[in-house]
A protein has these predicted regions:
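Conserved, structured core segments of small domains
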Residues: 1-101
């Protein structure tokens, strides 16, 4: 099942720049792992307001419980506000039956 995840990250006031950079490095590494595992399909950066740190992700998981576990494994998760929208295939989806890639 696919899910659109809106992730807004807010770094707690007083967090050192070293902690932020380390967490971002670990997040990038975890993103690669989730991609290799087939959980993370796409990422997008929408236009942001000043000071906003926002990402949209397309994730694949068996169900919402598994998705929540996947999201909790991301190093930035404790700083994120997450909104999840589950997707089901549309009968007119041009991608149905088309080979991936």
């Amino acid at each position: 099942m696919e899910f659109l995840v809106d992730m807004v990250t807010t770094v707690p006031e007083g967090t050192s720049s070293e902690t932020v950079e380390d967490t971002k490095r670990r997040e990038a590494a975890r993103t690669k792992e989730l991609t290799a595992q087939g959980h993370l399909l796409r990422l997008w950066k929408p236009p942001e307001a000043p000071g906003e740190w926002r990402t949209f992700g397309l994730f694949n998981a068996t169900d919402e419980d598994e998705l929540r576990q996947v999201l909790a494994s991301m190093p930035l998760h404790e700083w994120m506000t997450v909104t999840v929208t589950p997707f089901t295939p549309h009968p007119s989806d041009p991608g149905i039956g088309r080979p991936a890639g």
